[in-house]
Amino acid sequence: YSPTLAVAGGIASQHRGAVELCQAVNVLNAVAGNVGQTVRFGADMPTGDGYAGIEKLLAALDAGQVGVLLIHEANPVYALPASLKFRDRMKKARFKVSTATYYDETAAECDLLLPSLHSLERWDDANPRAGVYGLMQPVMEPVFPGRHTGDVLLDASRKLGGVFSKFSAPDFKTYLRSAWTGRASDEAAWRAALARGGLYQVPAEAAAVTPTGASFSAATPAFDGDGDFVFVAYPHSFLHDGRGANRPWLLENPDPVTKATWSPWIELSAATAKRLDIRRGEVVRIISPHGEIHGPAFPYAGLHDGVIAAPLGSGHTEYGQFAKDRGFNPLDLLGAPDAGSGFMPYVSTRVRLEKTHQYQEVATTEGTPRQLGRGIAEAIPLVYAKKGMTVLEALRAEGHAEHERNTELEVDAILGWREKQVEGRKLGNYAEVHPSWGMTVDLSKCTGCSACVTACYAENNIPTVGEDQVLRGREMSWMRIERYWEGGEDGEPLEARFVPMLCQQCENAPCEPVCPVFAAYHTVDGLNGQVYNRCVGTRYCSNNCSYKVRYFNWYKYNEKSWPEPLNLQLNPDVTVRARGVMEKCTFCVQRIRSAQHNAMLEDRELRDGEFTTACAQACPSDAIIFGNRRDGNSQVAQSSRDPRGYHVLEELNTRPAITYLAKVLNRVEA
């Protein structure tokens, strides 16, 4: 018996039949014998009031029963469907107070603004799930003269007296400490909780559950409207529900699937686009019984023909310079949440589509959508991976024709040239034995989430360039996630493959010999160095780079990206580049040199794994491994010897320092 698992959740279950769907999935798990195996029942998750609380508030507002409305770090004017008319109904409160950290749509409607401290500037706690209690403490002084909302409420309680007199703590930190008495009874326990960032209790034993027979309604969910398409609003991969819409790092980070940046788009299936003669970038109007939106069309082969989809997160009328007046808000098309379940009706509306005969180019970073036989994002079936086959051996086993990449004469010439190159480098400091830094990237673990990309922005002071420059192909991200489509033809399933692409730190780097001022050079430990003070901006290195991972500063991006106080986020260990300078991935050389310096001070050798690059540190699936390839026992050296390993564009003889591990395909043939 092999345990299975049925799961309900995500956007697909956000409709008026959501509760019935969850019940049906629970029944399926019980019938399949999964209860007690892959499904266990323990402590309930902590939950808020949900939509029921919103309904009570709206009823009280309509009845004129709200004297003071305090809204703390929430933006219901934007985050609720426009059909609820929360903006108009909140005006019925006699006095409205906002304690937001941003001037958002809700704050703009309030009578008093009390800016709250940022989460990095204040004390706080959280209970995200049963048994987990997070404890937050400030890591920096407040940048602006705001006050902790807790301190404001404590001051108000002391002045009001009466039932509020029990809140007598002089400040919120003291109140928080007293509230944690039950969890951290003494000073030692409190300090331990601070050091760990909270309290993480041992999960309770799974409760014994005996499924019993039950009945429930299974009516077909009703839809608002009678349009030809079902509309699906889904959280943006980076902006989520709109809370990240004023962060340029997230706006300029391409969506993993569409590779679109900055502004939202409207997805429709490729077949629907062909039938209606709609091309990418054509502005279409989507109309529902509750409202309408306008946006550029984005045909997508992975979408159902009867569905139109759009990401949440855009369409703000306030919230900051980067979020304001950018795109549309899909919530304008939706009705009220289901009163019984409280689920947002993300899949409960039928819409009509109209052409506007206007055009808006979608700012994408997509190159070629398919590999075109270049072997960039390799994959190997599980049956061959289990046998320890290489990608080439697996292709032979499947009957693919093998093409000779280089003739015997060419191979001899290449090998002889390389030997001369290596011998020629053995001068001065290059004659000594040094580490050889390298990386492996496991494509079976990479999900295309782009956490590595954002980490690289933060670590290396990379500027954002804006939508107009992205349209011109001038993005500055040192690391990009390339997405290639496989299949999707003749009934084959459509598959997306993701490949993190960065400077390969080639041993035979084509960028180095073409630089007329030796700004691009090879370091003793195998890195392709870049001397910014030497660079005169000829861009020859970029033209000669086989992987297109060098980026040129066309403007003074740094001046626009970090006006005060945003300059506080800059990494002091990394130079901020100016206009006319070429830049690229350095394998976080500042981290390498810092670790080497610390090891020298402690009179010892560098230890494998004691430091890593920002991208490897941020990867949630541990797809990236960094280390010294010359150390045969290092994790990177061992993983690079995996039979699945290959180098991108290996036939060019650039000898990259990055080894990719082919994605394992676990398919069940019909």
Task: Locate each region found by the language model.
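Active-site phosphate/pyrophosphate-binding segments
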Residues: 1-61, 183-190, 194
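Short acidic (Asp/Glu) and glycine-rich catalytic loops that position anionic groups and cofactors
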Residues: 2-7, 35-41, 66, 129-138, ...
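Generic, well-ordered alpha-helical scaffold segments in large soluble proteins
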Residues: 10, 24-27, 31-34, 57-64, ...
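Short glycine/threonine-rich loop-to-helix capping motif typified by GTGT followed
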Residues: 15-21, 84-85, 539-540
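A cross-kingdom feature strongest in bacterial/archaeal respiratory oxidoreductases
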Residues: 43-144, 161-162, 176-477
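Phosphate/diphosphate-binding loops
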Residues: 83-104, 138-157, 283-289, 296, ...
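Non-catalytic, well-ordered alpha-helical segments in soluble enzyme domains
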Residues: 148-170, 175-178
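Non-ligating segments of multi-cofactor redox enzymes
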Residues: 338-670
